């Protein structure tokens, strides 16, 4: 067993807590996990004790999961206080302390506001004594611990903190406090430099310059610098990226990844390239559900939430301005089929991986927390996650669209074979998000009912598809997928809907508060699941395709052509193979 100590407040509470745990019916781990019992506001002066949970698991499991403990529950202030007490200023933290710190920073928004955390950290930083136990010589140590926590917080949240007014003001305030304290406590010089490095500032002074007479001048000089960390991003409205749907017919659209600030001309350029038409021959028009039409001028902003709720963007040929759907399906479908059939399946899967990775790599771990707990204003905090989920849905629709728009049986059979190979390559490249989407697309009812098409698929392809399908089998809590994914080494992309389902299962199966105390055991389990993202991104993905090959595939993959109406897909399916 590991040698980690367990601290327990008030031994009489142990019996009460054990009962509480059984009543909660939390999923108890079968491996050896010491538990930190309830941290409460009372009994602050009680002695520390220890307790561990015995295990019957084998040594291999024990060696992997020992030396870890979980704070079961407590008030936010007490959890933070314990965390600061256990922090070490050494380069490497104890594993259990590092886990607790990460759990806290990942999930604090569940039980306290950012403003509450900022105020609590300022109180701890400014405290001259802590419960009468620390001597004055320990004050700088306390300050350094707070600064270490803040550094980890900034590192984890990155640009998110730059968009929150409370955190921006807090960082300015604590930076000012460090500048004031560094003369009295020179040991803070290291933390000050690290803090400035994180904030993107460059200090122009030495400790010797921080005499009381020079403090104000130095402080003014510091804040006259351009604070790069505040300018790292523009406003959310300007930089936020979304998938803009530009409809070609009533039920089919081209998906364009664009910034909210994109002009009509910028979007039209992408659409024209996708349709292989001259840009000057096309125009964009907004058609409201009321029937009202508005043609976009080149410099008009084409994306707005009000338009999304009340109408759609269509592209049309100027010489056919009087028709609503100028691009007939038959006109484009054959060219589209020939185009994808001429593409290399491995390279196409590689470009899918490249596109998905750019979305996946942009997701903040906290987005899963916001998405699950549905806190107020979560929409703007889950932009990247929503994009990847939307992408998964679009890839599924893309597969069905391409197959059902191919009117020739022989070419349709080739397309199905093509998608089976692409799915296999996505699995090999460890892009499980697109892998699932393609398999689900092939299993869409409008595609799977094409008996004449599937009858002509060679046996080896049917066998391969059956093997791929087995990985998506949901039985035993998706055991086949979980076992395969666990063996894959980073970089890899998980099937995000299932990861969200795991987090949601933990959330809905356990209360967030127990007797007005934060159920931190639940939050630890959620944080552990969310850290899957970090593990998947331990290594970065890089494509080795030539720029010329990549450009054509990138243009195709970035702007998939899909039909988003299940009714329209079924109509196409019955048109290809009428019901007997």
From Swiss-Prot:
Residues 67-200 form the N-terminal Ras-GEF domain. Residues 344-579 form the Ras-GEF domain. It is found in: Nucleus. It holds the Pfam family RasGEF. In the embryo, expressed in young neurons of the developing telencephalon, diencephalon and hindbrain. Not expressed in progenitor cells in the ventricular zone. One of its GO terms (molecular function) is guanyl-nucleotide exchange factor activity. Keywords: Guanine-nucleotide releasing factor, Nucleus. InterPro entries: Ras-like_GEF (IPR008937), Ras-like_Gua-exchang_fac_N (IPR000651), Ras_G-nucl-exch_fac_CS (IPR019804), Ras_GEF_dom_sf (IPR023578), RASGEF_cat_dom (IPR001895), RASGEF_cat_dom_sf (IPR036964), Ubiquitin-like_domsf (IPR029071). Induction: Down-regulated in nerve growth factor-treated PC12 cells. One of its GO terms (cellular component) is plasma membrane. SUPFAM superfamilies: Ras GEF, Ubiquitin-like. GO terms for biological process: Ras protein signal transduction. Guanine nucleotide exchange factor (GEF) for RAP1A, RAP2A and MRAS/M-Ras-GTP. Its association with MRAS inhibits Rap1 activation. This is Rap guanine nucleotide exchange factor 5.
